[in-house]
């Protein structure tokens, strides 16, 4: 690298990192502001403004052509802008939902919002990586922030225990991930994704080295997206973490990790040798997620197993290995982010002080829709969309990941996916039934912990849930424009070799 041209190149490429620069810079400003007053009311709104401005920037770049920046370590273009948009909007919704929640717990510290911003920066880097080093840096930046966010409520033993489990298992999975990268580098002699695909794997030993490394690499990714059999951490961590941040963890993390995985599959291993392996993991993930969710009485654990199942549905789209499958997965990531952040947002508003209030069993929430009809109505929309009920976005999302798999000859995989999706109707509709049709008096004898009044939600937080519910209807009816956009990425962006 010529040092005389390196600095001008970095300056030229800086606009491509607009979102990372703005979000990261505001995160630093939050820490400085927090040093003077740790509960400054302007801190979360600084985050909302930064994420909102960055989201608008990404919308204007959805039609941008593919390119690479920062010495070909990061990608730009419509594909990256779409993923960044999901991540930024999810982060924005998380802050709006966290404000009343953290105020109630008296944990509205500036560093919490700063960590959300830094975590978002890591996710953006992960979703735009064109190099294995960039993938690792983005993944670890995201992960370290999530470890802290999971357990920052120090008085809550469940949260601290969840954070410790997440950290230990996350560090363990990172070892597999790094070793996989090392083996792939040893086989190809490069860290750049397109160069890996172009490398000669002429001998049997070289091929074994590469595919062995790729298998270990996938283990690390499957851990991050809660795919079976690397999902065991998910229910405990989701249950113990602060509820709005659980929603962030379950949505934005998946968006960034699946985006990086798509880029690796498209650029580094464009052949179809991996399809059956990914399909097998998809089957295991769908079956375990849905079957285990049937027995759950804690709503957050139920949503955790639901999150595992939806990772399986996304893997069905990737298993097709086609442009339509990848485009369907992108659409599904958008829909999944909306309905899951909404579901966890509702649960955060139905949580009251004390251990009993944080348990959130189904029985403790019986008839809550009668007291909070807006929350009950939006939760109903989110549950129906998670089932895949038309005309909501979840139905279109599942169709768009299942149809390419059928076209790719994986009909057996789609049959399993449809059966598991039908099975999920039981536990999702059970939530709707408890919210709307079961009286609190019916369970008073067995669950006397029911609070007389739930925390008052802010207008911004309630508005966020309503917007999410309306967005699911819009995405289910007027999905053509979004689908056309995502298909275009794989004709001009992700499938193209960037210069």
From Swiss-Prot:
Single Gene Ontology MF annotation: quinone binding
The keyword Protease belongs to this UniProt entry's keyword annotation: no
Keywords: Cell inner membrane, Cell membrane, Membrane, NAD, Quinone, Translocase, Transmembrane, Transmembrane helix, Transport
EC identifiers of the protein: 7.1.1.-
Sequence intervals crossing the membrane: 16-36, 42-62, 77-97, 109-129, 133-153, 167-187, 208-228, 252-272, 274-294, 302-322, 327-347, 376-396, 411-433, 463-483
Record-linked Pfam families: Proton_antipo_M
Primary residence: membrane
Cellular location(s): Cell inner membrane
Membrane topology summary: Multi-pass membrane protein
Catalytic reaction list: a quinone + NADH + 5 H(+)(in) = a quinol + NAD(+) + 4 H(+)(out)
Gene Ontology cellular-component terms listed: plasma membrane
GO BP annotations listed: ATP synthesis coupled electron transport
NCBIfam families: NDH_I_N (TIGR01770)
Family of the protein in this entry: Belongs to the complex I subunit 2 family.
Subunit structure: NDH-1 is composed of 14 different subunits. Subunits NuoA, H, J, K, L, M, N constitute the membrane sector of the complex.
Functional note: NDH-1 shuttles electrons from NADH, via FMN and iron-sulfur (Fe-S) centers, to quinones in the respiratory chain. The immediate electron acceptor for the enzyme in this species is believed to be a menaquinone. Couples the redox reaction to proton translocation (for every two electrons transferred, four hydrogen ions are translocated across the cytoplasmic membrane), and thus conserves the redox energy in a proton gradient.
HAMAP family: NDH1_NuoN_1 (MF_00445)
Protein name: NADH-quinone oxidoreductase subunit N
């Amino acid at each position: 690298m010529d040092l005389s041209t390196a600095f001008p190149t970095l300056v030229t490429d800086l606009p491509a990192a607009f979102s990372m620069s703005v979000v990261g810079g505001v995160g630093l400003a939050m820490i400085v502001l927090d040093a003077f007053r740790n509960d400054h009311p302007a801190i979360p709104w600084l985050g909302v403004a930064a994420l909102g401005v960055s989201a608008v920037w990404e919308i204007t770049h959805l039609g941008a052509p593919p390119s690479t920046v920062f010495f070909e370590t990061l990608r730009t273009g419509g594909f990256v802008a779409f993923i960044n948009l999901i991540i930024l909007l999810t982060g924005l919704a998380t802050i709006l939902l966290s404000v009343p929640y953290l105020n109630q717990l008296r944990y509205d510290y500036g560093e919490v919002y700063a960590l959300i911003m830094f975590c978002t920066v890591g996710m953006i880097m992960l979703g735009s990586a064109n190099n294995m080093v960039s993938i690792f840096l983005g993944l670890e930046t995201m992960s370290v922030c999530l470890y802290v966010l999971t357990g920052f409520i120090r008085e809550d033993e469940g949260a601290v225990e969840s954070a410790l489990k997440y950290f230990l298992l996350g560090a363990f999975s990172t070892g597999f991930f790094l070793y996989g990268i090392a083996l792939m580098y040893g086989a190809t002699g490069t860290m750049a994704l397109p160069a890996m695909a172009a490398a000669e794997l002429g001998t049997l030993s070289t091929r074994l080295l590469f595919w062995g490394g790729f298998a270990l690499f996938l283990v690390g990714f499957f851990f991050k997206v809660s795919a079976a059999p690397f999902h065991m951490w998910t229910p405990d961590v989701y249950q113990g973490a602060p509820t709005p941040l659980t929603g962030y963890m379950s949505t934005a993390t998946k968006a960034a990790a699946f985006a990086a995985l798509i880029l690796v599959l498209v650029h580094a291993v464009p052949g179809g040798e991996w399809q059956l392996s990914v399909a097998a993991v998809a089957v295991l993930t769908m079956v375990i997620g849905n079957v285990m969710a049937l027995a759950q009485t804690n709503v957050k654990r139920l949503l955790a197993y639901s999150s595992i199942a939806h990772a399986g549905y996304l893997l069905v789209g990737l298993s097709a290995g086609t442009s339509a499958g990848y485009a369907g997965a992108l659409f599904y990531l958008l829909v999944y982010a909306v309905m899951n952040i909404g579901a966890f947002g509702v649960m955060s508003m139905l949580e009251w002080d004390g251990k009993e209030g944080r348990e959130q069993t189904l029985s403790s929430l019986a008839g809550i829709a009668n007291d909070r009809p807006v929350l009950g109505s939006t939760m109903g929309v989110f549950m129906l969309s998670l089932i895949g009920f038309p005309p909501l976005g979840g139905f279109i999302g599942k169709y768009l990941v299942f149809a390419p798999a059928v076209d790719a000859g994986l009909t057996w995989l789609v049959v399993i996916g449809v059966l598991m999706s039908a099975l999920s109707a039981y536990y999702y509709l059970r939530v709707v039934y408890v919210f709307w049709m079961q009286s609190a008096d019916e369970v008073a004898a067995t669950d006397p912990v029911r609070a007389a009044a739930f925390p008052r939600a802010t207008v911004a937080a309630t508005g966020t849930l309503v917007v999410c519910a309306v967005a699911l209807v819009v995405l289910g009816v007027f999905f053509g424009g979004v689908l056309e956009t995502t298909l275009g990425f794989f004709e001009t962006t992700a499938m193209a070799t960037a210069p």
